[in-house]
Amino acid sequence: KEEILGKYAKGALKGGLELSGLSQVIDKVLNKDKFFKSNINYGLVTTHFPSLRPKLVKKDDLTEDDAKSYMLASASCFPAFKPTKIGKNLYIDGGYYDNMPINFAISMGADEVIAVDLKAVGMVREVKNQNVKITYITPKNDLGSFLAFEKDYSRKAISFGYNDTMKVYKMLDGNIYTFKKGSLDRNYKRMHDKFNYYIDLFLSKVAKLKFKKITLSDN
């Protein structure tokens, strides 16, 4: 972790690193044809630099030419990463305005929100509409540096995130450690029964022992 933080600290001193790692991820997973044809809406938050004015972008605002750029911009954690240029403007991470844009999701029509709170650096705004059901998912383990897009860190974070989500929805048991559903209760009952068995065995043996009465005197 120290090596990664050192790398990004040096990058910050040079004006920020390029988002090449995330750019490659987007190229790999983003199918623009399916994305724009899907009836599922999409929104992101980025921040204009240097004014720090928020820019809330919906799928209808995006084009095939700028979709990737806005996705990169929303994750351009300045000063570790360079701002992303779109047209004549520069944009940085949306966390400078709202790191968990629940209000934006509600404004787009969401009647239930699943919010993943990574506890990363950034602003978190108070939810205005308290009538919407919100389920929070928070990591129970150290995910490593949020600046890292290396495969090993990503795989580890995905695994932890899956486990944390399954625990929230009662599909797995545990807190920091993860167990199959019901295994904790079964193991507890097994150990409890075993403990009681040995206690009863010990007491039954003690009851059969013959003790010699000893009288103590002051002389």
Region roles according to the model:
Residues 1-219:
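Patatin-like phospholipase
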